[in-house]
Amino acid sequence: MDKENFTRLRGELFCDHPLARYTSWRVGGKAERFYRPADLFDLQDFLTQLPSDEPLTWLGLGSNVLIRDGGIKGTVILTLNRLKELSVVNSQLVFREKSGTEDFFSGNGKTIIRAEAGVTCAKLAKFCVSQGLEDGAFFAGIPGTVGGALAMNAGAFGGETWRTVIGVETMNHQGEILKRTPDEFKIHYRQVEGLENQFFIAGYFCFNHGDPDKAKTAINALLKKRNLSQPIGKYSCGSVFRNPPGDYAARLIESAGLKGKSIGNAEVSEKHANFILNKGNASAADIEALIHYVAQHVSQNHGIQLVKEVHIIGRS
């Protein structure tokens, strides 16, 4: 299936396309098909022309995913900088067909932002600062896109994505867009249930209006804290494991003596033990083996089974 099988496409379609460059670990095999839509409407056109049973994988910044060396079957859709609309919206127009929602959003001092899935969380944070929305600053610490943040309830510095969400737009395999509210999902720590073969394409976020200078100060303080504690600039996925209740994965890994542990060219960071680094030419197999090694040794040392935050996908 190549571009000749489609009509009206404005995006870019590739076959047997290498994926490593699209992940923050810089590892992974090829996609059978890889599509970069021109925009949301082009994505709809593309999906309506795919077979109904075509496997779909959605990729944003590639920062919370490990793609195995054997690559991915079916079609990979890249949202980063493609689904990129970001704007303040009229609160009275948000989900007005959903009974009762207008009343909830009619309070003074609230600002509603619509961000599409391919917008980076860093860009969303900067946009919040420009609008004087201090409680959106935590998004600066999430190394991903809005779509990924919605899918896993990403968080940083005490903030969580879904605490700010008042609505989402999802898309199914047929390219149909649905508007949904948070009560249609089960939201957990780093997990969201209820998507059911749909994909997040936009979120509506509600923030309190505040002082732009305070918002800028808040984001700068959070970024300084992140730079001091995390291996910024290295090939990693961010946090590999979720924090267990009442503890921190990094503390457990460090106390098990695993800082600096390597398998192949994958290494547990000396700076932050919940980060695994690609030292330059690691394979996905190296990284996956080290993930399992760390989880096994933490279990042996502490009796705690760490749960992966990173998603491992593709063929070995």
Swiss-Prot record:
GO biological process, one term: cell division
Entry-linked PROSITE patterns: FAD_PCMH
Keyword Transferase listed: no
UniProt key word Cell wall biogenesis/degradation: yes
Reaction catalysis annotation: UDP-N-acetyl-alpha-D-muramate + NADP(+) = UDP-N-acetyl-3-O-(1-carboxyvinyl)-alpha-D-glucosamine + NADPH + H(+)
Obligatory cofactor(s): FAD
EC number(s) reported in the record: 1.3.1.98
TM region(s), chain numbering: none
Compartments in which it is found: Cytoplasm
Pfam families with a match to the protein in the record: FAD_binding_4, MurB_C
A single MF term (Gene Ontology): FAD binding
Keywords: Cell cycle, Cell division, Cell shape, Cell wall biogenesis/degradation, Cytoplasm, FAD, Flavoprotein, NADP, Oxidoreductase, Peptidoglycan synthesis
Active-site feature positions: 190, 239, 309
Domain FAD-binding PCMH-type residues, every copy: 27-225
SUPFAM superfamilies: FAD-binding/transporter-associated domain-like, Uridine diphospho-N-Acetylenolpyruvylglucosamine reductase, MurB, C-terminal domain
Record's GO cellular component terms: cytosol
Function per UniProt: Cell wall formation.
Record-linked HAMAP family: MurB
Family that this chain belongs to: Belongs to the MurB family.
Name the UniProt record assigns to this protein: UDP-N-acetylenolpyruvoylglucosamine reductase
Natural source organism: Coxiella burnetii (strain Dugway 5J108-111)
Name of encoding gene: murB
